[in-house]
Amino acid sequence: MTFDRRTVLAGLVLSTAVGLTPALAQSGAPKPYEVTPELIEAAKKEGTVTFYTATDVAVAERVGKAFEEKYPGIKVKVERSGSERVFQRISQEYGSNIHNADVIETSDAVHFLLFKRNGWLAQAVPAEVAKNWPADAKDADGYYAAYRAHLSVIGYNTQQVKAEDAPKSHADLLNPKWRGRIVKAHPGYSGTVMTGTDALSRALGWDYFEKLGKQRIMQVQSSTEPPKKLAQGERSIQADGNEYNMFMLKETGVPVEIVYATEGTPVAIGHAALLKNAPHPNAAKLFYSFIFDKDTQQLNSDVGGLRSYHPGVKEKETRTPLSKIKLLYSDPVKLEPEIETIKKKYEEYFGT
């Protein structure tokens, strides 16, 4: 198993959220569903499924293509944006009684507490999730489950920085020699970075970010962007960014390297859910099952560098196993009331 129970955050025990949402108290998850010929036929009649996602577009589109190859006649429409933008979009649409999306996925666990509370999600448990996902990687009432996990890592361009000179910790990023050479993603756009900012502020204190903000940071939006800035040579160091993008670049020969900071590396969990008012309910149900099956989870790992909860997924030997990485976690229940404070402090320290 690539993401074992020992590495799952106790604070991400999603059943905790049930206590916060008494209006949605349930007797438990519904009976798991299998993919049947009848479901496939009904999905083909609908002909399309719309997937709102925060996963890197290249990875999400590969998943969509794999689905189309397995189920000819059903088109996957991938709508990719940063987690916070996905959240804003679905909130605006549902607030206006507009229902375009069938399946939704973001890397901010808080979103799914809110989606569930608002009654926007359908109870649906694919058989694969029921069989293989640990209890703390799925909602106790069957509204959502962990589609992926990834880390927000420090990294560097190996043509611009020697290994012996590279930062080994978050504190090392405060060294004056890195001033003007660092790129960083934004918590107001990226769920990964919102989660990471929460974890790091609790571990290191806000004074760390205050000092980092004085390093003349190149500010970008998505956590997919810093690795690409390193690859293009626009900056030498990334303060944060998706581990999976770094895997993808490094494994194609791009001169980048990952650093797992001595203080710890933040973990982000990307949940997925079936929307209650999905315009293509059968195609949505089929696609929702598909994204959790072994082959899709293996595709996410092989092509996208994502960590999986599926016990059958095998990671590439060149990748550092989670058991050898010190991890930092964010509790979505504690993060939820702090989101606006985090955005305000970040703007104060980074000017954006």
Task: Give a label for each model feature.
Residues 1-13:
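N-terminal secretory signal peptides and thylakoid transit peptides that target proteins
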Residues 23, 149-150, 178-188, 210-213, 219-220, 252-276, 290-314, ...:
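Periplasmic-binding protein-like
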Residues 50-64, 76-91, 99-227, 231-234:
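Extracytoplasmic ligand-binding site segments that recognize negatively charged/polar headgroups
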Residues 110-114, 236-255:
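A ligand-binding cleft/hinge motif common to bilobed small-molecule-binding domains
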Residues 121-130, 142-145, 171, 248-266, ...:
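Short beta-strand->loop
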Residues 155-160, 198, 268-280, 291, ...:
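A bilobed periplasmic-binding-protein/Venus flytrap-type ligand-binding module shared by bacterial periplasmic
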Residues 296-352:
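C-terminal capping/gating helix-and-loop segments adjacent to ligand/active sites or protein-protein/ligand interfaces
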